[in-house]
């Protein structure tokens, strides 16, 4: 599974998802990067890479991936919420609020009431 042409397999089937979760952080980052080289528009993989960077404390890399995700998929509401959390952890509260406001707009567009509620709650906490 270390070849890029097989990277897509990690997203197929629960068994492979479990294997992915057992991989080291470095291996997960590598796998996601390889997959995105072949599938740059894949929202799930882009989100996954952003989340891996965020969990690793690599804030700028995470935010770069969230930005790419939201440029390609402006209605991917989880991207706004998790980007806002990443910004807030980095002490960038004003940017986190703006991200949440944009996410709330996306949630309204898509009718995603759960995401709307989560982001509105976080925005209230930050205000």
Protein language model regions, located:
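Canonical positions in the second alpha-helix
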Residues: 34-35, 68-69, 103
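Residue at a conserved register position within TPR or TPR-like alpha-solenoid repeats
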Residues: 53, 87, 120-123, 127
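Structural marker of alpha-solenoid helical repeat scaffolds
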Residues: 38, 72, 89, 106-110
């Amino acid at each position: 599974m270390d070849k890029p042409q097989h990277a897509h397999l990690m997203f197929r089937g629960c068994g492979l998802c479990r294997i992915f979760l057992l991989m080291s952080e470095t291996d997960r980052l590598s796998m996601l990067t390889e997959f995105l080289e072949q599938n740059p528009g894949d929202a799930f993989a882009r989100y996954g890479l952003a989340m891996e960077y965020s969990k690793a404390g690599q804030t700028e890399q995470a935010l770069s991936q969230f930005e790419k995700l939201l440029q390609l998929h402006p209605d991917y509401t989880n991207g706004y919420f998790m980007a806002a959390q990443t910004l807030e952890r980095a002490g960038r509260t004003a940017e986190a609020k703006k991200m949440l406001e944009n996410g709330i707009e996306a949630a309204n567009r898509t009718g995603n009431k759960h995401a709307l509620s989560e982001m509105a709650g976080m925005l209230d906490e930050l205000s």
